[in-house]
């Protein structure tokens, strides 16, 4: 069936705004390398629901939305838009490579870095460039990837400074909004949670 990246009309205005923020502010994979060519994003997906838990360094943070994205090179991200009235660019991303599908209804992504974006970061093309913190962890996405009716996303990671990151996100039952962009490169594509979606 056709896929759409537009939030449906039943979504709350805050979710629609968060989706727009995430679409515009996709993570840029660079710190000091602002001039490096960035890999193209080929999949963007957003779940409608709520954060049951989102903690950074043991501190609870309110989140507006959670999105999944994947680049042509295979790197995947779970990006959280934080509900911060003082900073609409406050975004934290669990980023990793070599995602896997241990069974049909589970996608696991080993995390090797956290991307931390805020209004105080240096900018490229007018958007904040995230700070990159090497980390170890895992994200797990559960649900029916064919119908896009996902159940939950859970992520845990610890960066090199010992700071912990934890996400527990629960779907409200609305099918995910997915945007798929045609690959430009040849070769075998990386494993995606949406490989079965046509």
Predicted regions and their residues:
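An ectodomain-focused feature that recognizes extracytoplasmic/extracellular
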Residues: 31-110
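N-terminal signal peptide c-region/cleavage motif recognized by signal peptidases
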Residues: 25-27
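Bacterial N-terminal signal peptides that target proteins for export
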Residues: 6-18
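Acidic, glycine-rich flexible loop segments
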Residues: 109-167
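Long terminal segments
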Residues: 34-51, 180-198
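Edge beta-strand at a domain terminus
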Residues: 96, 137, 152-197
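Short, surface-exposed linear segments at secondary-structure transitions and domain or protein termini
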Residues: 97-108, 142-148, 174-184
